[in-house]
């Protein structure tokens, strides 16, 4: 994947200014980050500009629209140092509105999925072939399964097996037995589906899933919808007890 790399560590709490200065100085070739970093740049620096009436009008003209998007793409790339070949996002779900915009300007990003117990990467795909809303395909030497009768259409827990998967928690056989089954598969606790091309999409966490009268409700999908509404800074969906529906 990479070799002969130089890793730069920030010596202070990574405020937006400190991060921006570091990118400008280091000019990284590869960036691995959480969604919050790219979302802040797009939402605070880009969206306010392109949502102005005159910009919306200009972006309805094909030739001008292409030039505007290319200009925005370059400015966002420059904000990350200007040299990187790919920006890999992980650790949480990428905001759908931001992702759609990144795709529209052909920004070189991709989304990966993993966990500490797995070394940590389980899925990844090059940004040029990455499928929107997914988190890529299983990486080499890793076997992934969706614990579902129909992995393409019915959500199930993501199970992982491979040389990068831990053998167990240190001196804690009870905790190990709870997550690694008899076949050697690690139960991630994450829910997802897999399309016909092997791309995985995370839908939520088992512990977060709300069961209402037998119906499975995934908070993340509702949160994504509410998050786009004006005036909402943050949102969290939680189930409440119900005698009629159970939760």
Stretch-by-stretch model annotation:
Residues 67-69, 73, 165-189, 206-207, ...:
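Conserved ANL (AMP-binding/adenylate-forming) active-site segment centered on the GW(Y/F)…HTG consensus within
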Residues 162, 167-168, 191-247:
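AMP-binding/adenylate-forming catalytic core of the ANL superfamily
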Residues 107, 137-140, 150-179, 215-217:
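Conserved ATP/PPi-binding loop(s) of AMP-dependent carboxylate-activating enzymes
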Residues 91, 114, 136, 190, ...:
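Active-site glycine-centered loops adjacent to acidic/histidine catalytic or metal-binding residues
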Residues 12, 35, 113:
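Short secondary-structure boundary segments
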Residues 10, 89-90, 146-148, 155, ...:
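Thr-Gly-centered strand-to-loop micro-motif
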Residues 5-26, 217-222:
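ATP-dependent adenylate-forming carboxylate-activation enzymes
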Residues 29-32, 42-131, 143:
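Gly/Ser/Thr-rich phosphate-binding loop
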């Amino acid at each position: 994947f990479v070799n002969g790399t130089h890793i730069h560590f920030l010596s202070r709490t990574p405020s937006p200014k400190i991060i921006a200065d570091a990118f400008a100085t280091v000019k990284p070739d590869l960036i691995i980050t959480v969604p919050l970093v790219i979302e802040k740049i797009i939402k605070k620096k880009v969206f306010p500009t392109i949502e102005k009436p005159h910009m919306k009008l200009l972006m309805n003209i094909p030739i001008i629209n292409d030039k505007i998007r290319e200009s925005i793409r370059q400015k966002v790339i420059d904000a990350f140092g200007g040299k990187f070949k790919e920006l890999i996002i992980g650790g949480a779900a990428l905001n759908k509105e931001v992702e759609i915009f990144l795709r529209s300007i052909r920004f070189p990003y991709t989304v990966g999925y993993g966990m500490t117990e797995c070394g940590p990467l389980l899925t990844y795909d090059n940004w040029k072939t990455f499928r929107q809303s997914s988190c890529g395909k299983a990486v080499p030497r890793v076997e992934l399964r969706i614990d579902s009768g129909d992995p393409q259409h019915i959500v199930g827990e993501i199970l992982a097996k491979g040389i990068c998967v831990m053998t167990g928690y240190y001196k804690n056989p009870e905790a190990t037995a709870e997550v690694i089954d008899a076949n050697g598969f690690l139960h991630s606790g994450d829910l997802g589906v897999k399309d016909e091309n092997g791309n995985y999409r995370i839908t939520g966490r088992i512990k977060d899933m709300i069961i209402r009268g037998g119906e499975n409700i995934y908070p993340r999908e509702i949160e994504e919808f509410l998050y786009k509404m004006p005036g909402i800074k943050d949102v969290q969906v939680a189930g409440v007890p119900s005698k009629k529906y159970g939760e």
